[in-house]
Regions:
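Histidine/cysteine-enriched polar flanking segments
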Residues: 2-263
Length: 263
């Protein structure tokens, strides 16, 4: 787990265009102005002047496409799962953030194989299928990753079954057992994304799911937008009324909204 008690500077390797404020919503989906229960509002942090530079300095984001949709019951520490414990053993440190997602495996062989698992790696925007119980393979994977910083894209297809990611991915922190604030907010943000993506005819172009702890539950409403070009947009303190602006600026375009940015 990353310690983000003080502000840190991201090592993300690409240029990003900024806009200062999130555009207001153009329509009400029925979820746009939903709020968490009033008793939870008291426990949510008031927006500070800025939440910039509150993600850790990243080399790579690596997340398991677990297919486990029951994010409310993910254990507080996902390392309880063998695959997460194994991958964390070899991958922790060196600026790697390792998480679990609710996204389903993309390889049929992986889906039907109890040993092979799918991981997505950014900013390389690649998915690999790997034997999560094979320490030799895991060690080999992280030797490659750790010998190349995020400014240097790596070609994993030379060593593993790998494929480029061709869709935008939106992952919302909904790790309820880690922090109830993220569990509750994550659900209403997820619902609004579903409605907006449908209205904008983007549901086939964007994968939407949940991700485990990414640091900074104090900024509940955390999410990351991952683009096929490798760009990553880290946001915090998101509410449903921000979603249309995020879709317009960071999914349809490559702009980062500064008031919600954690990078």
């Amino acid at each position: 787990m990353f310690n983000i008690s003080h502000k840190l500077t991201s090592k993300l390797p690409f240029q990003i265009r900024y806009i200062q404020q999130c555009p207001p919503p153009k329509y009400d989906t029925g979820c746009t102005y939903c709020n968490p229960p009033s008793e939870m509002e008291e426990n949510l942090k008031s927006p500070p002047e800025s939440i910039r530079n509150t993600i850790p300095p990243l080399n790579r984001l690596i997340f398991h496409r677990s297919g486990n949709k029951d994010h409310d019951n993910w254990p507080k520490k996902v390392e309880v799962f063998d695959i997460m414990r194994n991958i964390s053993k070899f991958g922790r440190g060196n600026g790697n953030m390792i998480c679990m997602s609710s996204l389903s495996p993309i390889n049929e062989m992986t889906t039907n194989d109890q040993q092979n698992v799918d991981f997505a790696i950014y900013p390389d925007a690649q998915t690999i299928s790997i034997n999560g119980n094979d320490s030799t393979e895991l060690e080999k994977l992280f030797k490659i990753i750790n010998s190349n910083d995020s400014n240097n894209s790596i070609s994993l297809s030379k060593h593993f079954r790998a494929s480029k990611i061709d869709k935008t991915i939106v992952l919302i922190c909904g790790h309820t057992q880690r922090d109830i604030r993220c569990g509750v907010l994550g659900k209403i943000i997820h619902k609004e994304f579903e409605e907006v993506l449908k209205r904008e005819n983007l549901e086939n172009d964007v994968e939407l799911g949940y991700i485990s702890h990414v640091g900074g539950h104090v900024y509940a409403g955390n999410l990351v937008i991952l683009k096929p070009n490798g760009k990553m947009f880290w946001y915090g303190m998101v509410r449903p009324h921000h979603v249309q602006g995020l879709v317009d600026q960071s999914i349809k375009s490559d702009d980062l909204i500064e008031e919600l940015s954690r990078q």
